[in-house]
């Protein structure tokens, strides 16, 4: 039996949303009706994220960064989405992402 959840009118902030579990969670929240802020240290269109170490560099080189693509998929579901670069170790960046142009976050999915 599937559990139905209506998150219409809610804003979710998902960190680590460029791939894997964070990306899957962001899409699931959007399917449940939430607008989503996708916060990740990497965006496809942005150079320079390699400074965050070898994992970031490998992910970019292998085309495994999907933050902006995920935002487009969420918009395709009829929800609002915003992809932002955010270092979750920097409190000011997280607070800025949580109070984005979509409004204050109602849901936080730390990944």
Q: What is each residue range found by the language model?
A:
Residues 1-104:
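Short-chain dehydrogenase/reductase
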